[in-house]
Amino acid sequence: MRALIQRVTEASVRVEGAVIGRTGPGLLVLVCGMPGDTDRSVAALAGKIAKLRIFRDAEGRMNRSLLDVGGGALVVSQFTLAADTSRGNRPGFSAAAPPKEGERLYEAFAAALAETGVAVETGRFGANMAVALVNDGPVTIWMEG
């Protein structure tokens, strides 16, 4: 699974103009299931993200995790994280998991992150979504697991 995480002061996702998920201070997590991903690898990535020390402590150092600060997570599926731009000018996305498996992995990731104790809200798999965020820092990290 690929994940692009962004530390945010707030983030929301809309489908057809209606907000379907939002978080206050915490993380926006864009995820893409990949062939070969397992429930175990997805859960491990979720656990790593929950414990990743990218929030400021009292001295201003990135030394606290999402769990430490009691932050939430907005999890949004994004198959374009599997883009192959090595040939031509149009990216290919065949490296992403097929849609049914991608949806299963997305749901498994959101559930695994919630099981760590993080308050999780989600987008809608396969929908055309409008994501709004205020990046804090900015802190943006690419992860694979």
Curated annotation (Swiss-Prot):
This is D-aminoacyl-tRNA deacylase. One of its GO terms (biological process) is D-amino acid catabolic process. An aminoacyl-tRNA editing enzyme that deacylates mischarged D-aminoacyl-tRNAs. Also deacylates mischarged glycyl-tRNA(Ala), protecting cells against glycine mischarging by AlaRS. Acts via tRNA-based rather than protein-based catalysis; rejects L-amino acids rather than detecting D-amino acids in the active site. By recycling D-aminoacyl-tRNA to D-amino acids and free tRNA molecules, this enzyme counteracts the toxicity associated with the formation of D-aminoacyl-tRNA entities in vivo and helps enforce protein L-homochirality. A motif (Gly-cisPro motif, important for rejection of L-amino acids) lies at residues 137-138. The lineage of its organism: Bacteria, Pseudomonadati, Pseudomonadota, Alphaproteobacteria, Rhodobacterales. NCBIfam families: D-aminoacyl-tRNA deacylase. InterPro entries: Daa-tRNA_deacyls_DTD, DTD-like_sf. It comes from Dinoroseobacter shibae (strain DSM 16493 / NCIMB 14021 / DFL 12). Gene3D superfamilies: D-tyrosyl-tRNA(Tyr) deacylase. Belongs to the DTD family.
